[in-house]
A protein has these predicted regions:
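Enriched for short, Lys/Arg-rich terminal
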Residues: 1-13, 17-24, 28, 54-62, ...
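A short, surface-exposed loop/turn module that caps and links secondary-structure elements
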Residues: 31-56
Length: 85
């Protein structure tokens, strides 16, 4: 069962502002994660002190999200250096 993907406004803004190829690559990985939670298993890490926040890498970009049973909420998409601010 594919989960519904919801984007926080900051994450949606970041995806719109980046170049098209990178945005497409990140959206593809998010889609894979929504389809199959174990698809990116070796690339997903729980954030310390993040109250259920998880992250995965796409090149030098980090996608921070919460994983609920039916909804995958994308909270932040940012370059590696500023993703954890």
């Amino acid at each position: 069962m594919q989960r519904r993907v919801e984007y926080h406004r900051d994450a949606a803004f970041a995806l719109r502002r980046m170049d098209r190829a990178t945005s497409k690559r990140i959206r593809s990985k998010i889609g894979q994660l929504a389809d199959d939670p174990s698809a990116l298993a070796n690339n997903v890490t729980a954030l310390k002190g993040g109250a259920g926040l998880m992250r995965f890498r796409v090149g030098d970009w980090r996608v921070i999200y919460t994983d609920e049973l039916v909804v995958l909420k994308i909270m932040k998409v940012a370059p590696r250096g500023s993703a954890y601010d």
